[in-house]
């Protein structure tokens, strides 16, 4: 199953499926420490494939990771609703 399919499955879980969410977090992200939790929905263009989570990371609803390259989130990080983490850029020259 691809990371995008796992992300879709994560976003479709019921609130009572906490064990399933924990399992999918371990599968979606390249690295996920202990006690990580992301409130669905979660969005990433690579499904979290380039995201590294430290220990005890919490993200509220609507986390978006533009993970075209690696994103590192350190231990004991808490994020509010609708946070965007973007590693991509566009050409900066007007030419």
Segments predicted by a language model, with ranges:
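N-terminal start-of-domain structural block
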Residues: 30, 34-44, 48
């Amino acid at each position: 199953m691809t990371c995008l399919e796992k992300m879709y499955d994560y976003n479709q879980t019921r609130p009572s499926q906490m064990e399933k969410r924990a399992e999918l977090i371990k599968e979606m992200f390249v690295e996920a420490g202990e006690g990580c939790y992301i409130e669905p929905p979660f969005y990433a263009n690579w499904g979290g494939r380039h995201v590294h989570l430290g220990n005890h990371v919490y993200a509220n609803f609507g986390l978006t990771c533009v993970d075209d390259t690696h994103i590192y989130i350190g231990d004991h990080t808490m994020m509010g609703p609708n946070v965007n983490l973007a590693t991509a850029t566009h050409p900066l020259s007007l030419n």
